[in-house]
């Protein structure tokens, strides 16, 4: 119980320093914390602000978020790389392939940089991103370009470039 209390206290300090305890723009503190938790799970530190922008762009366009990390959270498979088509059919409020909008709450405990990215996304028109190889995450607004990169990702996955828990 003491460890959880320490985590909550640390989160509140970091949220306050990131400006999340106050409602900012369209999102309240709970929603920003949820966005930050997805950013933390989906991206490398260098990509946090771009992942934040993708989330916002998808929400603004009324698109499903389709974030693998939210499905992994629902399945208790955090840290997985691969997401099966069957997994995207899971009936869960955290399945952002089936449910539009943000999941009902955070999927993890985000760090300060993810919190800052949730509040201050980078400018861009991206609505897709994919990590095609370790340390090679690409962002685009083109579904066609995303499709080409997805083929590259699958090839790299089969070649063992990722440590996957398939």
Residue ranges of each PLM-predicted region?
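Bacterial extracytoplasmic/cell-wall-associated proteins, especially those involved in peptidoglycan
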Residues: 1-166
């Amino acid at each position: 119980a003491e460890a959880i209390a320490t985590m909550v206290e640390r989160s509140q300090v970091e949220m306050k320093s990131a400006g999340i305890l106050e409602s900012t723009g369209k999102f309240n503190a709970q929603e920003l914390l949820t966005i930050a938790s997805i950013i933390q799970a989906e991206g490398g530190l260098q990509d946090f602000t771009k992942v934040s922008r993708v989330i916002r762009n998808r929400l603004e366009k009324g698109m499903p978020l389709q974030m693998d990390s939210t499905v992994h959270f629902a399945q208790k498979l955090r840290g997985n790389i691969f997401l099966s088509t069957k997994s995207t059919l899971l009936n869960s409020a955290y399945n952002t392939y089936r449910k539009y909008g943000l999941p009902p709450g955070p999927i993890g405990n985000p760090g300060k940089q993810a919190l800052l990215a949730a509040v201050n996304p980078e400018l861009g028109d991206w609505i897709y991103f994919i990590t095609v190889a370790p340390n090679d995450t690409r962002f685009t607004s083109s579904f066609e370009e995303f499709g080409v990169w997805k083929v590259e990702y699958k090839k790299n996955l089969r070649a063992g470039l990722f440590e996957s828990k398939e």
